């Protein structure tokens, strides 16, 4: 199934995010993992918990997307070192879902670490920048790695981020053709700046997860 929206708001200053905003993540330099201050008070309230991994080239907006989803914030971010870990609780179709989100680094030097993060993932969101064609071409490599190494039941979603920026280089029709080759992947164009389609993207992922694991 393909879900695309051609409207969105995004900006690209100071890494993947622009404008103001707070950064509440604390880094563990030894492990290369950033643990979000967002936490859950009572894990027993969740009916289902799932691991989700964010993949894609650096500066495509992975961290901005996760920050918008988890904290409803948008602002400048530093490049992720290794991976960042966040938790988001959602109620979808009257089911309490806990998403354990691994936001992976997009730099080439961290590429060898990536399989460690997406192994055991129930879902993956691969992000590209609609104004940079090369990030969509690289997305195909991420998808290929997932197909080889991840669970065959993995829920795959593609996110075309920064949709309001000028000079679009990746057309929706091109993405839809690629998705038709993949089969049942989810696709949304998103805006971390405005929040457009962020909740919709993850809600659809949760629905697929519920269907897969009910």
From Swiss-Prot:
<dbReference type="GO" id="GO:0003924">
    <property type="term" value="F:GTPase activity"/>
</dbReference>
<dbReference type="GO" id="GO:0006886">
    <property type="term" value="P:intracellular protein transport"/>
</dbReference>
<dbReference type="GO" id="GO:0012505">
    <property type="term" value="C:endomembrane system"/>
</dbReference>
<feature type="binding site">
    <location>
        <begin position="161"/>
        <end position="164"/>
    </location>
    <ligand>
        <name>GTP</name>
    </ligand>
</feature>
<comment type="similarity">
    <text>Belongs to the small GTPase superfamily. Rab family.</text>
</comment>
<dbReference type="GO" id="GO:0006971">
    <property type="term" value="P:hypotonic response"/>
</dbReference>
<dbReference type="GO" id="GO:0005886">
    <property type="term" value="C:plasma membrane"/>
</dbReference>
<dbReference type="Pfam" id="PF00071">
    <property type="entry name" value="Ras"/>
</dbReference>
<keyword id="KW-0547">Nucleotide-binding</keyword>
<dbReference type="GO" id="GO:0005769">
    <property type="term" value="C:early endosome"/>
</dbReference>
<dbReference type="GO" id="GO:0030139">
    <property type="term" value="C:endocytic vesicle"/>
</dbReference>
<dbReference type="InterPro" id="IPR027417">
    <property type="entry name" value="P-loop_NTPase"/>
</dbReference>
<feature type="binding site">
    <location>
        <begin position="56"/>
        <end position="63"/>
    </location>
    <ligand>
        <name>GTP</name>
    </ligand>
</feature>
<feature type="binding site">
    <location>
        <begin position="103"/>
        <end position="107"/>
    </location>
    <ligand>
        <name>GTP</name>
    </ligand>
</feature>
<keyword id="KW-0342">GTP-binding</keyword>
<dbReference type="GO" id="GO:0005525">
    <property type="term" value="F:GTP binding"/>
</dbReference>
<dbReference type="InterPro" id="IPR001806">
    <property type="entry name" value="Small_GTPase"/>
</dbReference>
<feature type="short sequence motif" description="Effector region">
    <location>
        <begin position="77"/>
        <end position="85"/>
    </location>
</feature>
<protein>
    <recommendedName>
        <fullName>Putative ras-related protein Rab-5B</fullName>
    </recommendedName>
</protein>
<dbReference type="GO" id="GO:0005811">
    <property type="term" value="C:lipid droplet"/>
</dbReference>
<dbReference type="InterPro" id="IPR005225">
    <property type="entry name" value="Small_GTP-bd"/>
</dbReference>
<dbReference type="GO" id="GO:0140220">
    <property type="term" value="C:pathogen-containing vacuole"/>
</dbReference>
